[in-house]
Amino acid sequence: MPGARDALCHQALQLLAELCARGALEHDSCQDFIYHLRDRARPRLRDPDISVSLLTLVVTACGLALFGVSLFVSWKLCWVPWRERGLPSGSKDNNQEPLNYMDTETNEQENSEDFLDPPTPCPDSSMKISHTSPDIPLSTQTGIQENCAHGVRVQRQVTEPTSSARHNSIRRQLNLSNPDFNIQQLQKQEQLTGIGRIKPELYKQRSLDNDDGRRSNSKACGKLNFILKYDCDLEQLIVKIHKAVNLPAKDFSGTSDPYVKIYLLPDRKTKHQTKVHRKTLNPVFDEVFLFPVPYNDLEARKLHFSVYDFDRFSRHDLIGQVVVDHFLDLADFPRECILWKDIEYVTNDNVDLGELMFSLCYLPTAGRLTITIIKARNLKAMDITGASDPYVKVSLMCDGRRLKKRKTSTKRNTLNPVYNEAIVFDVPPENIDQIHLSIAVMDYDRVGHNEIIGVCQVGNEAERLGRDHWSEMLSYPRKPIAHWHSLVEKR
């Protein structure tokens, strides 16, 4: 029956087509019929075919994703272990280290102990690149006379116009809510903010003990050969420096550029210096120096030799020193005495940096602290010319904070500058016990940065003379108290 129905439909369609071709039917009806035939002749996808296609596409995508995941897992599980098995065991051990926190803490403690341990007495390994220059002329060996201080006007540095405003200013800088200095509040803040900080005071005692042990076990850094003789007619001590042997190397080339400075202590104004001998550890000087001194004064004098390594662009390294005293006990003295002395290693803390004289005066009613920088002597030479360009910087300190700072003028090309300059700080009486002064002698450098020659402190937190000077100032108000202070390295 379905076949007969299809044949009947086919005949009906042919009949309609012939009628349209003859024009027996309307044109619009024929056009609708033609469009209907075209639509029936166009191939169409059935709904089941569309569903199967979509399902096939989804299955293919999932299969590709699973295939990629399987490849990645197989590479991780199989390829990486196989590659590591091909490497030697030593490289694997070096690349993979277990995370052992206990070992890490132990290593940090060992590193800190190594950091705190003092260097060896003769730092042969601590070398630096040295750029030498021609020998220092003898014209720079003469002592520098102190500048005449007569007629020098005292300069005052005053900042605020009224004492009440100045006192309020310093209270604001001290973060005080009332005139009384709240020590407990500052200590509480320090405890709260000090968690996790490195406390240097925990290591001071150990470093001092190490320094004492190092000095007791110090060994010589070479030998110095020189000749002493006293001329009774001219009352002169004749010193001939012959040579030095077995000096430690200070340069990367394994050599040094040594020279020797000579003082007849306690006088440091008369200084002699040998020429610089380049790239040698066994220099031969053969230079003669004269020190005018009466024979009766020899017992109280000391001959001080300082052996340095010369460097044009940085500080000269101190190799060591030799001190000779009790000349009258030497064999054959005052005739010619040939001596060999060990060059003793000294740290930078033992280097004589010079002295600074200043006075302190406090006026309780006005709340004014005046420090007058008078002069300095025997400062350490920082320039190639054998001199320095010193100035003094004074800082008002409180609990490690710098509240104010002032500085003097710069004195050119001298090791014995004279200033006579007053610096004034406004400190209320209730705060005078909580502050201290930090004084630094600086070397001015026009090209590079200014270098610190030495420092000293005065106040209740200072040591020895600095504390005594401060206490004497408070005991005698309105009276200038002057003292000499030795300069030390900045810590």
Curated annotation (Swiss-Prot):
Residues bound to Ca(2+) 1: D251, D257, D309, F310, D311
Any Gene Ontology CC annotation: hippocampal mossy fiber to CA3 synapse
Parts of the chain that traverse the membrane: 53-73
Gene3D superfamilies for the chain: C2 domain
Stretches in topological domain Vesicular: 1-52
Localization of this protein: Cytoplasmic vesicle, Secretory vesicle, Synaptic vesicle membrane
Membrane topology: Single-pass membrane protein
Modified residues (Phosphoserine): S177
Binding site for Ca(2+) 3: D311, S314, D317
Xref: PROSITE patterns: C2
Domain C2: residue ranges: 220-341, 352-485
Note accompanying the cofactor annotation: Binds 3 Ca(2+) ions per subunit. The ions are bound to the C2 domains.
Residues that, per the record, bind Ca(2+) 4: D383, D389, D443, D445
Main location: membrane
Region (Cysteine motif): 9-31
Residues the record lists as binding Ca(2+) 2: D251, D309, D311, D317
Gene Ontology terms for molecular function: calcium ion sensor activity; calcium-dependent phospholipid binding; identical protein binding; metal ion binding; phosphatidylinositol-4,5-bisphosphate binding; phosphatidylserine binding; SNARE binding
GO process annotations (BP): calcium-dependent activation of synaptic vesicle fusion; chemical synaptic transmission; positive regulation of vesicle fusion; regulation of calcium ion-dependent exocytosis; vesicle-mediated transport
Cofactor: Ca(2+)
Family: Belongs to the synaptotagmin family.
Assembly information from the UniProt record: Homodimer; disulfide-linked via the cysteine motif. Can also form heterodimers with SYT3, SYT6, SYT7 and SYT10.
Protein's job: May be involved in Ca(2+)-dependent exocytosis of secretory vesicles through Ca(2+) and phospholipid binding to the C2 domain or may serve as Ca(2+) sensors in the process of vesicular trafficking and exocytosis.
UniProt domain comment: The cysteine motif mediates homo- or heterodimer formation via formation of disulfide bonds.
Protein name stated in the entry: Synaptotagmin-9
Organism of this sequence: Homo sapiens (Human)
